[in-house]
Amino acid sequence: MEYIRVTKENLEKEHICCAISNNKDVQVSSKKAWLADRFEEGLVFLKSVERGKCFIEYIPAENAWVPIDAEGYMYIDCLWVSGSFKGHGYSSDLLNACIEDSREKGRKGLCILAAAKKKPFLADPKFLKYKGFAVCDEADNGIQLWYLSFDNDADKPQFKECAKHPHIDEKGYVLYYTSQCPFNAKYVPILEKTAKENDISFRAIHIESREDAQSAPTPITNYALFHDGEYVTNEQMNDKKFMKLVNG
């Protein structure tokens, strides 16, 4: 497999794997705008030259849009290989490229979000364990921080206190999200519309800065849905899934 690094220079012409429509699609435009602002902060987006979901996205942990203390580490935003790309070792290729790059940049190791059992839009814990990762912290909602250290003397990454006990003091449905995931540009407005039509208390909070992301009340900032103050899910949903959740 041949891979290419997406940069500010080729961003407009390259597809971004998780959303492969044209640049006018709101999902693509929102993701590319978010990426463009992150490249100067050290973000790397490495993908297959072929169209499809086969890529890794990572950034120095100090600049990551998650509430973690992991100074000197590299944080993996997303490692996604699916469809016909699965089963060929491409996930290992991408992770190995990240490891090599991170070592060359003097990073202490890698960290990434997962859970004890595979959850949608999170890394596969079996794959992480196979690759030498271990759990270094866990929030009350079961979201875990995994790490792979290059230095046995390095401090382990950990969640910030604000994220260890996911809870908010607000009734109704409250959704925290960022533009890191392109699907949000399409589906968050759908949920807002559905909630309004069905007289459901719903508020979407768009996290638009690294500082706000790093102080969020949830270990996951891409998409975190709360109901009456309690964390519910990180799984993006359409109108049907949302109404199924509401109706129990």
Describe each PLM feature range.
Residues 1-51, 161-163, 182-183, 190-194:
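Short amphipathic alpha-helix that is part of the acyltransferase structural core
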Residues 47, 51-62, 75, 80:
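Conserved beta-strand in the GNAT
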Residues 64-76, 86:
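A conserved beta-turn-beta hairpin within the catalytic core of GNAT-like acetyltransferases
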Residues 81, 87-102:
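Conserved acetyl-CoA-binding loop-helix of GNAT-fold acetyltransferases
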Residues 102-120:
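Conserved GNAT acetyl-CoA-binding A-motif
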Residues 113, 132-146, 232-235:
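Conserved catalytic-core motifs of GNAT/GCN5-like acyltransferases
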Residues 140-165:
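C-terminal "cap" of GNAT-fold acetyltransferases
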Residues 228-248:
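Non-catalytic, surface beta->alpha helical segment in thiol-disulfide oxidoreductase systems
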